[in-house]
Amino acid sequence: MAGSCTIDEHNHFGPIVGDACYGGLDFTLYFEEAFLSIFPAATLILAATVRCFLVRSASLKVRGGWLHTLKLLLLAPYSISQLLLLAFWMRSGTPKTDLTIASTVLRFIATLPCGYLIHLQHHRSLRPSKIISIYFLLTLLFDIPLARTIWTIQGLRTVSAIFIAGTVVKALLLILETWEKRRLVRPMYASPAPEDWTGVINRSLFWWINPLLFRGARTSLSVGDLFHLESCMLPDPDGKHRVVMHWENVTNKDKAGAMVVPIAKAFKWDLLAGVFPRLCQSGFIISQPFLVRATVELFVYRDRPDSRSKATLLIGAYALVYGGIAIATATAQHKTYRVITMMRAALVDMIFEKSTAINAHKNDDSAALTLMSTDIERITHCGRYIHDTWASLIEIGIALYLLYNELDTAGIAPIIIAFGCTVTAMKIAMMAGERQNLWIEAIQKRVAITAEMLGSMKGVKISGLTDLLFNKIQALREHEILASQKFRSLLIAVVGLSNFNTLMTPIVSFTIYAMGSGDAPNEILGSARALTSLTLFNLFAVFIGTLVESISETAMALECLDRIRNYLAQEAHQDPREVNSSPVTEKTPCIEAFEVDVGWKNGDESILHRLSYRIERHSLTMIVGAVGCGKTTLVKAMLGEVNCLTGKMKVNCDRMAYCGQDAWLTNGSIRENILGGSPYDPPWYSTVVAACGLEKDFTELTAGDQTAVGSKGVSLSGGQKQRLGSLDVLTRAQALARALYSGVETILLDDALSGLDPVTDEHIFTQVLGPNGLARKQHLTVVMVTHAVHRLPYADHIIALNTDGTILVQGTFDDCCKRLDYIQGFAIAQPPAIQMKSAMPKAVEVTKAAPYSDEAISDARRSSDYQTYLYYLTTVPWHNWLVYFGLMAIFVFLQAFPTVWVTWWARDNDAQPNKNRSMRIGVYWMFGVLGACFLLATACFYMLKIVAKTASVIHSRLLRTVVNAPMSFFASTDSGTTLNRFSQDLELIDMELPLAVLQTCLALFLCVAQLIIIAVSARYITATIPLCVLVYCIIGTFYMRTSRQLRIMEIEAKSPLFSNFMELLNGLITIRAFNWAEQYKLRNRALLAESQRPYYLLYAVQRWLSLVLDMTVAGFVLVLMGIAVGTMHSTNASSLGLALVNVVSLSASVKALITDWTVLETSLGAVTRVKHFAESTESEDMVQERDLPPEDWTSRGTVEYKNVSAFYRDPSKPVLKNLSFRVHKGEKVAIVGRSGSGKSTLVSALFRMIELCEGTISVDGIDITTLRRQAIRSAIIGLPQDPLLLEGSTIRENVDPFDYCPDEAVINTLKRVGLWEILESKDGLETIASPELFSHGQKQLLCMAKAMLRHGNIIVFDEATSGVDPETDEMMQELIRSCFAQHTVLTVTHRLDTIIDYDRVLVMDNGILLESDPPRTLLSRPSVFRELYKSSRGWEEYERQERAEAEARRRERVEKERAEEELRGRRGLISEKEEPETVSAIREHWNVVNQLFGGIIPRAVPRTRSRSRDHSAERRESKRYSGGDWTGEGDGDGGDGGLGRRDTRRHLTGLAARGLH
C-alpha cells in the first residue's frame, strides 16, 4: 500500500526491508540506490566517456534526420526530470537515505555523456549504441522495484510521480535508440549485412533473422536470399588475417599446440565477448535449486498470511530466471559460433595460401583435402565447447558447495565420482586423438583413390576396372569402418561417463546421508531437502557431462589443429633460380644455366648433371631424348619447381606459360578456359582461336565456345582436350590458346602437341610455331619438349639429353647433324612445303551462345525429412531399430523414474522418519546399476552394429551410383561436387550423425518421460501439455522449412570451394609459372565468403530455435506455477516439487535436444544429398542388359558394326552415323581421322560408353547391347589415351589388377617393357606407385604390360601411343606385333607412319566412315587417308622408300634383260640336251639374287625373247608400282624365304626412329 513505510526502515543496507513494508517482500531503498542506481550510472559515465573518445574521430556515416533530432529532444525532458528529482530530494523535510542525493546527482550527470554519445553514435556508427541501449534497458528494469519502493515511503508521492514520468521518457528513448538507421546511412557506408544495423536487443532476441525464416517458410531459398555477413566473419581480402600475423610470429612452429596461441590472440576480444553472457547463463541455471526450495517451503507453509504475495513474487522470479536462461544461453552460444565462423574463415584461407607455396613434388592432394574438409569441420564442431569448459568448472564448484549445504559430508560423493569420470575422460581423450588420426588416415586413403577414379573415369571404364575399383574402394571403406569402431568405442566410454555421473551420484550421496542421518526433523531426508538436492544433482550431472564431453572434444580439436600446424609448418617452395624481372635488352638470353645439377631436394642424388645451356630471346628451342631421360625434369627446372643442387640458373622473365603432358581443364566453358581471367578482346581472341584450329570445333558445338567442357574435359575428345586444355588458362595444363592470349612472352611446352591428328598438328605447328606463326610474329620465346623429331629443322636451338641425365648435344639443327651423324635420320634435309593459304590465320567470328548457367536449387532442399529418415532407417533391418529403441526406452525409464522413487521416499520421511529406509535404498541402487548396464548395451548396439552397417550401405549405394553413371554424367558434373559426397557428406554421416542420433533419441525420450512425470505430479498442468507439444510442433515445422534448405545450401556451397582447391593442387606448377597464385587466392576467398553465408546463418537459426524453445519452457513453467498458486490449498508440496525438479531436467533435456537436433539435421542434410544423388543419377545399365557372355567369348575375335548410329545426350544429334564394317579374327585395324572426327567415339560405342540410337554391334556374333556393360569391358582389353596409374597401390596391383598371373609372369612382362630395372632397385612388385616414379611414356608402358597380362582376344588402343617418344612408340608397336599377333587389334591413332603394315584403315570424319581399305591401297590412289598421310612425319620417308624400291626394281629388270640377252647369245653353244640344266641353273641364280634384294623381283622364269628391249613393258611395270603398291607375285611375303616388304619397311622405320637413342 502506498505510503505505508517510513524512511527509517529503508535507510540501511538491508537488503530486505522490515515486515512493515509489503510484509518484508521488498529491498531497502538504500540497497536499491547503491546497486540499482549508483552502480549503473557510474558505469555508464565511465563507459560512455571512453566510447566518446574512441568514436569521435570516426568518419560520418549517417545523416542526422528526424531520428537524431527526436532522440536529443527526448533526452532534454529526461534530464529535466532528474534535475527536478534532485531539487525535491534536496528540500528539507523530504524523506531520503544517505545515498539518495549521490544517486540522483549521478543519474543526472550520466545524462551528459549519454547525450554526447547519442549524438556521436548516431552519426559515426551504423549500429545503435550498445552502451546506451544496455544502460536504458537495465535501468528500466531496475526502476520498477525503485518506483515501487519510493511509492511505499510516506511523503514521496510527488517524487514517485516525477520518477515514473522520467522512467516513461527513458522507455521512449530506448525505443528510439534501438531504431535502425538503415535509411539514413550515407551510400558509401551502406552495408548489406543485417547484423551491421541491429542493436544489442535485436541481436539478443534474434529478430534480425526473422525475415529469412519467414521467406524460407514460404518459398525455396536461393543464394541471393541469404543475408550478407559482417566483414569480420569473412576472409581477409589481403590475406593478412590476424591469425596469420600471430602465426608468423611463432618461433617454434614444430611444437605441438603451437597453433592454439595465435588463434587465441587473434580472437581474444571475440572470445571475451562470450564470457559475460556465459556467466549470466551459469548464474540463472544455478538459481533453479533456490526456486525449487522456496516453492516447496511456500507450499509446505501455505497457510501463512503472506503466502499469496510471496507466490506472486515467486512467479516473477521464475519469469526472470527462465527468461534469463533463454536469452543468456542463446547469446552465449551465438557469440561462440561467431568465433567458430571467424576461425573457419581464417584456417581455410591459411591452408589454401600454404598450398600455393608448397613444393609440388611433396604435395599430397588427399592430405590437403582432408585438412580442408574433415579437420576443419572437426575443429569447428568441437569449438562449441570453447566457453563450456571453464564455465563447467565454476558451475561444478558452486553446485558442490550447495550440495554440501544440503547433505553435509554426503555432498563429497559427487566430487569423488566426478573426479574419477574426469580423469578417465582425460585418459580416453588421449587415446581418442591417436585413434582418430588412424581413422582420418583411412578416410584420406579412401578419398584419394576415389578422387583418382573420378578424374580418370573414362580410362577406368575402358580398362574394365569398374567392378575391381568398386570392390577395392568398398574394401577401403570397410577398413575405415573398422578403424572408426576403435574410435567409437571410446565415444561410447565418453557417453557412459557422462551418464554414469547422472545415475550414480544421487544414489551414493542419498545412501550416505540416509545411513548417517538421525530422526530429527532437521536431519531427515525430507521433501524440501531431497527435491532441492535432486535439482542440484541433475544440474551437477549436466555440468560434469559437459565438462567430460568438452575435454574429449577439445582433445580431438587439438589433434586436428596439430595436423593443420604440421601442414602450415612445412618448408615452403623456394625458387632456386635467379629471376630478373627488370627490363632487359633484346640480346639478353631468356634462360641461362651454368653447370647445374638438378634434383628433387637437397641431399638427394641429382637427376640431371652439369647442365649448361642458353635459351635466346624470341627463339624456338626443342628438347629431345629417350623416354625417362629427364626432359620433363629439365622443363620443371626452368620453371623453378626442381632444386638446383649445384650451379646457377638465371631467368630474365617473371612469368612463363607452362603446358604439361596431360590435358587438363577446369569445369567451365571453353572461352573461360582460354581467357583465364584476362579481359575479352574479340579480335585477338578470334585470332588465337583460329591459330589453334578451334573454329571448326566451335561451329560443331551447339553452344560454341560457351560449351562447358566438364571436369578434366571428359566431355571432349582427346584431341579437343589437348588443344583446349593443354593451353588452359585457369587450372589445367596450359597450352597455346591460353599462352598466346595471355600475352606471356615465354612458353614452355612439355610434349603438348602429342595426340593430335596430322592435319591438326600441322595446322597448329604452322600457325603458331612455324616460321610465320603467331609465336614468331609476337616475338615469343618457346621451349618445346617433343617427340616429333621431323620438326627439328624448324628449331633455332636443339637440346638432346642423354639417358644418364647429361646433355648429349645442343645447338642448331645443322650443328647437331654435323656432330652426330644419326641425327640426320630425325628429319628431312629441308622442311616440307606446307600447303597453307596464309601463315597468319585470319580472325574468325567465334560462335556465341547463352552463358552456361548452374543448375537451379535442388528440390531436395525442401524435401520431406520423413523421406530422409526413412532412407536412413532402411539401411539396416527393422528389427535392429526395434531392439535399439527398446533398449533406449528401458534405459530412459531407469534414469527418470528414480526421481519419483526419491520423492516417495521423502514423503514417507515427512510422515515417519526413515521408514522403509533399507528397501528404498536397495531399490534405488537396483535402478542405478540396471540403468548403467542398459546405457552401455544401447550405445554399443547402435554405435558398433547399426552405425557400421549404415556406413557400409550408404557408401556402397553412393559408390555404385557413381561407377554405374554414364559418361554424360561425368561430362556435365564437376568432379569436386561428386568428390564432396565421398568426403564432406560421408564425413558428416560417419562422424556427426551417429552421435547425434544417439544423443537426440536419448534427449527426446527423456523429454517425453519428464513430461509424463510432470503431468502425473501436477494434474492440472496435464491439460496444457498437449498445447505445449502443439507449440513445439508448430515451431519445429516453421524452423525446419528454412533450416532444411540452409543445411543443404551449406553443404552445396562447399563444392565449388573444394573444386577450386583441387584445381589448385592439380595445376600448382602451371599456376606458379603464370604467377596466378594471387588470382587463385582471391577466388578462394570469394568462394569461402559465399560458403560462410549459409554456414553462419544455419548456426543463427539454430540459436533462434534455442531461444524460442527455452522461452516456451519458461512459459510452461509460468503456467505451471500459475496453476499451482491458483490451487495452492489443494496442491501437494512434494508433488509440485517433483514437477519442478523435472522442469529443471526438462530445461536441460530441451537444451540437449536442441543442440543434438541441430547437429542431427545438419548431418541429415548429407543423407538427403546422398539419397537425392542415388535416386536422380541415371544408371548406364539398361533393363535389357542383363546377360553374361559365354566363357569363351571373344575367342573368335570378330567385331561387326551394322548401321550403327550413336549419341551422347540427344538422340536427334548422333555423333556416329550409319557405320558398317566387320573386323575378322587376328586382323589389325587402324582408325584414323582429324581430332573430333569420331575415332574415340567409335571405340567408346564398342565399350558401351555411349548409347546406340540404331544399328547393332556384335562381337563373336553376340549383340553387345544385350550384355552387361562391365562384362563387355572386362572381356575386351582396352588401353586409354591417358595412362591409368592407381597411386598408393602396389605395382603388382596396377599391372595385374585381376590377379591373373604369378609373380614370375608379371616380372617377365615388366622386363619386356623395360621397367623392371627401375622397380628392382626399389621394392619390386610391392613398390608403391607414385607420380614421380615413372615418366609419362613409362606409365604408358606400364599400361601396356597390364594389357599383355590380360585375358582376351580383342584389344583396343585409344590413342595409347600419342604421348610417347618414337623409341617408346616403336617398342609398343613391336609389342603389338609380337604379343598380340593372334589378337584382333583396333588402334585409334594419329601416328599414321606406325600403321602402314596394318591390314586395314578406317578413316572417320564427323562421325561418318569415309574409307575402309588396306593402307597401301588407300595410299595408291587419291584418298582422304593419303591426304592425312601426307601431313604425317612418315610421308617423306614413305616416298623415299617407294622411290628407292622402284629404282631397285628398274635395275633388276635391266639386269634381268641383260642376262636374258647373254643367255640367248649362248643358246647356239648349248645343245638341246643341255638346255634344261642351264635353265635350271639360271633359275637358281635368280632365286639367290631375289633373296639378296628382299624378294622384290618377280618370280618369273627367263624365257627366250628378242634382243630388242621391251621399253613399253618396262614403262607399264614402272607405272604399276609408281602408285605406291606392288602387284607382282613377290610383293607380299617376300618370295622364297626372303624378307617381306612389311619387314623391310618396319626395319627401315625402326632404324630411322631410333636415331638419337
UniProtKB/Swiss-Prot annotation:
Question: What PROSITE patterns has UniProt attached to this entry?
Answer: ABC_TM1F, ABC_TRANSPORTER_1, ABC_TRANSPORTER_2
Q: Name one GO molecular function term.
A: ATPase-coupled transmembrane transporter activity
The principal localisation class reads: membrane
Q: How does it sit in the membrane?
A: Multi-pass membrane protein
Q: So where does this one cross the membrane? A: 27-47, 70-90, 99-119, 131-151, 159-179, 256-276, 311-331, 385-405, 412-432, 490-510, 531-551, 882-902, 921-941, 996-1016, 1020-1040, 1105-1125, 1135-1155
* Residues of the ABC transporter domain: 593-829, 1199-1431
* GO biological process entries: transmembrane transport
Q: Where is the composition biased (Basic and acidic residues)?
A: 1507-1522
Write out the residues that bind ATP. Answer: 625-632, 1233-1240
Task: Report the InterPro entries cross-referenced here.
Answer: AAA+_ATPase, ABC1_TM_dom, ABC1_TM_sf, ABC_transporter-like_ATP-bd, ABC_transporter-like_CS, ABC_transporter_C-like, ABCC_6TM_D1, ABCC_6TM_D2
Region Disordered, as annotated, extends over 1439-1464, 1503-1557
How is this protein annotated for GO cellular component? fungal-type vacuole; membrane; plasma membrane
Spell out where the chain is glycosylated: N202, N249, N667, N916, N1132, N1203, N1218
The UniProt disruption phenotype note reads: Does not alter the yield of aspercryptin significantly.
| Domain ABC transmembrane type-1, chain residue ranges per copy | 279-556, 882-1162
What pairs make up the disulfide bonds?
none
Where is this protein found?
Cell membrane
Summarize induction of expression.
Expression is positively regulated by the aspercryptin cluser-specific transcription factor atnN.
Q: Which UniProt keywords apply?
A: ATP-binding, Cell membrane, Glycoprotein, Membrane, Nucleotide-binding, Repeat, Transmembrane, Transmembrane helix, Transport
Q: Show the Pfam families listed in the entry.
A: ABC_membrane, ABC_tran, TMD0_ABC
What the protein does?
Answer: ABC transporter; part of the gene cluster that mediates the biosynthesis of aspercryptins, linear lipopeptides built from six amino acids including 2 highly unusual and nonproteogenic amino acids, 2-amino-octanoic acid (2aoa) and 2-amino-dodecanol (2adol).
Family named by the database record: Belongs to the ABC transporter superfamily. ABCC family. Conjugate transporter (TC 3.A.1.208) subfamily.
Name of the protein described by the UniProt record: ABC transporter atnG
Q: Please name the source species.
A: Emericella nidulans (strain FGSC A4 / ATCC 38163 / CBS 112.46 / NRRL 194 / M139)
